[in-house]
A protein has these predicted regions:
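Active-site-proximal beta-strands of protease catalytic cores
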Residues: 134, 184, 188-189
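Catalytic cores of alpha/beta
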Residues: 121-129, 172-186
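A generic structured-segment signal
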Residues: 163-166, 176
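Conserved small/polar residues in nucleotide/adenosyl-binding loops
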Residues: 194-201
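Active-site entrance/lid segments in N-terminal catalytic domains of soluble metabolic enzymes
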Residues: 1-160, 164
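Flexible glycine-rich beta->alpha loop in the catalytic core of nucleotide-sugar glycosyltransferases
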Residues: 139-140, 186, 193
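Catalytic nucleophile loop
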Residues: 32, 166, 180, 191
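Glycine-rich adenosine-cofactor-binding loop
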Residues: 167-171
């Protein structure tokens, strides 16, 4: 299935695995990427050298694109930002903060930057800052969320932006993917029970 997202990231399926803290490590990220989606390592509050190790371990398991989720409120965020640039990951997703101070560094290394946003205002700011796409995350999602539901947030962000929009929040199967397409998204980010049950997680 080809969409604007698959073409942007060089993947086969328009599905990004969410960067679940302490669950999304190298084994899960590699498995998702090998299956055709975009696997994500969740950096969470981990030290930068742990993230570096996870990136290198993922590269041993896949030659497909994968990414790192950088939680910007982490005290290690500046060091992690440098590590992902040095290690040459394909994609960075960001949450819990403003990635603008790292955008130039990542873009200079050819890294696609996809911030997670919970409002139209933040989505527009990220587009102006140079984001390649955004994840519009409804309040059904976990992590650092806003007040809008996925159903209301995604079409508003789609209408406001000229870059790809990925839907997140309450999406767990093909019906959710189809609904996201109807809302105007070009793909989804999932943190579903399907992933949580996988033997590649740390659970």
């Amino acid at each position: 299935m080809q969409t604007e997202l698959t073409r942007l990231l060089g993947i086969q399926a328009p599905i990004i695995q969410g960067g679940m803290a302490w669950v999304a490590e190298h084994t899960l990220a590699a498995a998702v990427s090998n299956a055709g989606g975009l696997g994500i390592i969740g950096a969470a509050n981990a030290p930068a050298e742990w993230v570096r190790e996870q990136i290198r371990l993922t590269k041993q398991l896949t030659d497909k694109p994968f990414g790192v989720n950088v939680m910007l409120m982490s005290p290690y965020a500046p060091e992690i930002a440098q590590v992902v640039a040095e290690e040459g990951v394909s994609v960075v997703t960001t949450g819990a903060g403003n990635p603008e101070s790292y955008m130039a560094l990542w873009k200079s290394k050819g890294i696609k930057v996809i911030p997670v946003v919970a409002s139209v205002a933040l989505a527009k700011r990220m587009e102006r800052a140079g984001a390649d796409a955004v994840v519009a995350e409804g309040c059904e999602s976990g992590g650092h969320i806003g007040e809008s539901t996925t159903m209301t947030l995604v079409p508003q962000v789609v209408d406001a932006l000229n870059i790809p929009v990925i839907a997140a929040g309450g999406i767990a199967d093909g019906r959710g993917l189809a609904a996201a397409f109807m809302l105007g998204a070009c793909g989804v980010q999932t943190v579903s029970y399907t992933h949580l049950r996988a033997h590649e997680t740390t659970l």
